[in-house]
């Protein structure tokens, strides 16, 4: 985890609820977050040229979470491909949310194309 020294900034992002995820690709910072849809959360995002902003709202990244009120993003690069991780409320073992992965990102100059679930990764107990 990285900590920045300075004053705490409050960002006024449309539909923001919780669960921010910050990452950098090239020279651009991306802030992805859980946002309120019509009854369930979805993901929206904003971009900035510096970590201190000014942040530009870019819109929805996903539709509403399936089977769940909550959805939190995690975006990572692995072997040259970008992936979006999130969860829904399908229960696999006990009370833990089921993790999901949406396919490889398609990037344009400043935006991420809207994501559609690609493959479900289920954590299964092996005996």
Predicted features along the sequence, with ranges:
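Carbohydrate-active catalytic/glycan-binding domains of CAZyme proteins
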Residues: 1-127
């Amino acid at each position: 985890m990285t900590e920045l020294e300075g004053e705490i900034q409050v960002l006024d992002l449309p539909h923001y609820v919780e669960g921010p995820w910050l990452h950098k690709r090239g020279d651009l910072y991306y802030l992805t977050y859980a946002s309120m849809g019509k009854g369930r959360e979805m993901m929206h995002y904003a971009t900035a040229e510096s970590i201190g902003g000014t942040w530009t709202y870019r819109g929805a990244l996903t539709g509403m979470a399936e089977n769940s009120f909550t959805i939190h993003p995690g975006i990572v690069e692995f072997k040259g491909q970008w992936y979006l991780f999130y969860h829904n409320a399908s229960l696999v073992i006990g009370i833990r949310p089921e993790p999901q992965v949406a396919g490889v990102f398609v990037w344009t100059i400043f935006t991420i194309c809207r994501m559609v679930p690609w493959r479900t990764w289920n954590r299964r107990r092996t005996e």
